[in-house]
UniProtKB/Swiss-Prot annotation:
It comes from Danio rerio (Zebrafish). SMART domains: Galanin. GO terms for molecular function: galanin receptor activity; galanin receptor binding; neuropeptide hormone activity; type 1 galanin receptor binding; type 2 galanin receptor binding; type 3 galanin receptor binding. The modification Alanine amide is found at A61. Endocrine hormone of the central and peripheral nervous systems that binds and activates the G protein-coupled receptors GALR1 (galr1a and galr1b) and GALR2 (galr2a and galr2b). This small neuropeptide may regulate diverse physiologic functions including contraction of smooth muscle of the gastrointestinal and genitourinary tract, growth hormone and insulin release and adrenal secretion. The gene is gal. Belongs to the galanin family. Pfam families: Galanin, GMAP. This is Galanin peptides. The lineage of its organism: Eukaryota, Metazoa, Chordata, Craniata, Vertebrata.
Length: 118
């Protein structure tokens, strides 16, 4: 009985050792400290580029406080994007109708004479 308990304990220790050496850790290690990416995000590009501290900058100026580009402030970009999306949807609808043969029964396009006649 004592041999079985001892064998189980030894096998558990060996399994734990193998998983640790192969990189398969059971519990993830806690990450600590600052990385360049986290410092750059929190402090902003000005602090990283010129190596100034927070006291020199008088506060945080991270990405959250940076002004947006002017392209994104205007609504013209959004309208243009919506027009492109509508054009693509219309084209795909046309292709689908053409595929199922629904366009064959429609008359051909109108000529300029037919448009000018009331």
């Amino acid at each position: 009985m004592h041999r079985c308990v001892g064998g189980v304990c030894v096998s558990l220790i060996v399994c734990a050792f193998l998983t640790e050496t192969l990189g398969m850790v059971i519990a993830a290690k806690e990450k600590r400290g600052w990385t360049l990416n986290s410092a750059g995000y929190l402090l902003g590009p000005h602090a990283i580029d010129s190596h100034r501290s927070l006291s020199d900058k008088h506060g945080l100026a991270g990405k959250r406080e940076m002004p947006l580009d002017e392209d994104f402030k205007t609504g013209a970009l959004r309208i243009a994007d919506e027009d492109v999306v509508h054009t693509i949807i219309d084209f795909l609808s046309y292709l689908k109708l053409k595929e199922i043969g629904a366009l064959d029964s429609l008359p051909s396009s109108l000529t300029s004479e037919e448009i000018s006649q009331p």
